[in-house]
């Protein structure tokens, strides 16, 4: 892992964008809860954020981002109490909570379906959000023709940074975090 010291920004009396040379950040995710998915595999993501855009690569889009839906969202769901109090009841990468419980219990309601999908649905391999137009990062514009140049530029920058820092998802087989 590499980083740059943030002490100057943390101790600064200024607010907002303090150091103009810091104009992007790379973040990553592998897992939140180890047993959220069969085989204890993670949900590998890497992202680059600039002032205007957030670009995300989901390395395994066939996996469930919030963990496997156990049971398979049949009619035989865990009770409300289990959903609220047991992280492992279903979608274990989202901690047990009233919000998670409500979303799961109302997943078939027409007004709640979109929110359920945003919270628990599978994600595409590439996501791009225009933060000026969509600050809440709801509308993925990665495949829209007018964003292809931005997407390609951010993808190139992200992958170069990951290679330069020997990120295990882009160096070697890319499976380091998935191996026991």
Where are these regions (language model features)?
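C-terminal cap/loop subdomain of S1 sulfatases and analogous C-terminal strand-loop tails that border
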Residues: 1-127
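Long, internal low-complexity/basic segments
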Residues: 101-126, 131-180
């Amino acid at each position: 892992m590499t980083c740059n010291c943030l002490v100057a920004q943390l101790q600064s009396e200024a607010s907002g964008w303090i150091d103009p040379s810091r104009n992007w950040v790379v973040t990553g995710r592998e897992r939140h809860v180890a047993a959220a998915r069969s085989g204890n595999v993670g949900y590998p993501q890497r992202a680059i954020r600039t002032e205007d855009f957030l670009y995300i690569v989901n390395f395994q889009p066939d996996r469930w981002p919030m963990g496997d839906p156990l049971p398979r969202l049949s009619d035989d769901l865990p009770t409300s109490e289990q959903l609220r109090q047991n992280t492992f009841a279903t979608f274990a990468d989202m901690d047990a909570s009233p919000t998670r419980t409500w979303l799961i219990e109302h997943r078939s309601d027409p007004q709640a379906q979109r929110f359920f999908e945003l919270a628990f649905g599978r994600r595409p391999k590439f996501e791009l959000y225009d933060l000026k137009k969509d600050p809440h990062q709801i509308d993925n514009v990665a495949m829209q023709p007018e964003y292809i140049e931005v997407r390609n530029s951010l993808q190139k920058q992200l992958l170069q940074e990951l290679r330069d820092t020997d990120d295990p998802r882009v160096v070697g087989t890319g499976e380091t975090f998935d191996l026991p």
